[in-house]
């Protein structure tokens, strides 16, 4: 059967009909695909293919639309496009003509991350000079994270092993999804406003950029920067970075490392206490040596001065010094002993019993040594004082008179008479003997 003349089409007529059918059936559609065979000739138009694992189609974006793109299309990039399905009449090729194209998936998120990071950095939000130092001793910690994730288990395990005395409050929250960022921000602001915590820890485990996106929220980054309480961010793995890391006062590569940075190891703390106790013993010995040196110098000064009144004064001073030194030393010893008892009570539940017993025996030994040393010092000083008193009595003029000698002085002016040529017949003298004074006259 032969067709009628009006039923016979030329290729151009068929392509025109097919084009009209396609354009009428698909007014404007969205397609997500991977770019391939990207070409940009001098005309400024863009030509490429849109493909997935099973198929591909040609696409074009003309210069009037392509000039407004916010990125440079490259081979392998995943994009989201909008356009019309049509047919290129000259070659009979089915294609899409696009009026919009944007990055899709992680590529779009990465670009948004870099743009927001650059803007906040320009505002000074990440300036190191703005960051607050962490306290030396963290006593109360707020942990904002998922209550069921691996991050909270890692953090609590490390904290319990290193420093079980730390008070930890878990503030549970979503860590991914559309509402996670707002919830994290509210918890952070509430924890900061309460004034109860020394540090706030934001943390979650690893994941894709999309999984971690809640921690790239602008409002959360600004809340971290405005917090009066120091904030530590430990989001994802060591290679993951989020805006919360840049805004926080300290960025930890993993949740476990964050816990290690926040608290000391109880074993290191015990070693530090033992070193402190040894230092206290050394200081006590030094104080005793200084006291003995001062006492020796006081005795030397005492031996160089002969009047009995000064001797008595120095004796009283020396005794007073001994009493005061003893009292001060006992007070210092009691304070140090109290500190050691407190340290022993704190660590009693976390250290071997033999270490506590050793510290108590050392404390008992320290109590006895200062008292014995002080007693020996006082006895030695008393012995020296008695010897000095006997020496003074031996050379005293009054002792010489008591042995039968007399001291002659002139009655008129009290001058001591040592030689015969000092007197003349008729001079009145006084003779001082052991039990009184005799008036005499020279003949």
Curated annotation (Swiss-Prot):
One of its GO terms (biological process) is DNA catabolic process. GO terms for molecular function: exodeoxyribonuclease VII activity; nucleic acid binding. The keyword Flavoprotein does not apply. Its main location: cytoplasm. InterPro entries: Exonuc_VII_L (IPR003753), Exonuc_VII_lsu_C (IPR020579), OB-fold_nuc-bd_dom (IPR025824). It catalyses: Exonucleolytic cleavage in either 5'- to 3'- or 3'- to 5'-direction to yield nucleoside 5'-phosphates. Keywords: Cytoplasm, Exonuclease, Hydrolase, Nuclease. The keyword Metal-binding does not apply. One of its GO terms (cellular component) is cytoplasm. Signal peptide: none annotated. It is found in: Cytoplasm. Bidirectionally degrades single-stranded DNA into large acid-insoluble oligonucleotides, which are then degraded further into small acid-soluble oligonucleotides. This is Exodeoxyribonuclease 7 large subunit. It comes from Stenotrophomonas maltophilia (strain K279a). The gene is xseA.
């Amino acid at each position: 059967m032969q067709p009628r003349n009006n039923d016979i089409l030329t290729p151009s007529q068929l392509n025109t009909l097919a084009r009209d059918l396609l354009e009428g059936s698909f007014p404007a559609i969205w397609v997500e695909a991977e770019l391939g065979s990207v070409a940009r000739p001098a005309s400024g138009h863009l030509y490429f293919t849109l493909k997935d694992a099973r198929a591909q189609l040609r696409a074009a974006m003309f210069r009037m639309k392509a000039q407004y793109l916010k990125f440079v299309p490259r081979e392998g990039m995943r994009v989201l496009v909008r356009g019309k399905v049509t047919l290129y009449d000259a070659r009979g090729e089915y294609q899409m003509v696009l009026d919009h194209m944007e990055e899709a998936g992680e590529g779009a998120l990465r670009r948004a991350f870099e743009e927001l990071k650059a803007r906040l950095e320009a505002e000074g939000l990440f300036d190191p000079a703005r960051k607050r130092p962490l306290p030396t001793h963290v006593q109360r910690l707020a942990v904002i994270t998922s209550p069921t994730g691996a991050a909270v288990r890692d953090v609590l395990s490390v904290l319990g092993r290193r420093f079980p005395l730390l008070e930890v409050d878990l503030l549970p929250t979503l860590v991914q999804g559309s509402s996670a960022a707002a919830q994290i921000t509210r918890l952070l602001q509430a924890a900061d406003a309460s004034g109860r915590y020394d540090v706030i820890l934001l943390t979650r485990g690893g994941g894709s950029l999309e999984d971690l996106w809640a921690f790239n929220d602008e409002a959360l980054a600004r809340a971290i920067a405005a917090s009066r309480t120091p904030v530590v961010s430990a989001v994802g793995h060591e290679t993951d970075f989020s805006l919360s890391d840049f805004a926080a006062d300290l960025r930890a590569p993993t949740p476990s490392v964050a816990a290690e940075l926040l608290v000391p190891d109880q074993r290191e703390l015990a070693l530090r206490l033992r070193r402190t106790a040894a230092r206290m013993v050394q200081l006590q010995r030094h104080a005793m040596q200084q006291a003995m040196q001062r006492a020796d110098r006081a005795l030397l000064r005492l031996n160089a001065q002969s009047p009995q009144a000064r001797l008595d004064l120095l004796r009283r001073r020396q005794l007073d010094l001994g009493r005061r030194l003893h009292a001060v030393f006992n007070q210092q010893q009691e304070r140090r002993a109290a500190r050691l008892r407190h340290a022993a009570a704190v660590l009693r539940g976390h250290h071997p019993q033999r270490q506590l017993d050793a510290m108590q025996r050392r404390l008992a030994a320290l109590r006895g040594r200062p008292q014995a040393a002080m007693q020996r010092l006082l006895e030695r000083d008393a012995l020296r004082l008695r010897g000095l008193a006997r020496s003074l009595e031996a050379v005293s003029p009054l002792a010489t008179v008591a042995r039968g000698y007399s001291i002659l002085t002139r009655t008129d002016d009290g001058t001591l008479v040592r030689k015969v040529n000092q007197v003349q017949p008729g001079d009145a003298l006084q003779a001082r003997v052991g039990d009184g004074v005799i008036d005499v006259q020279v003949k």
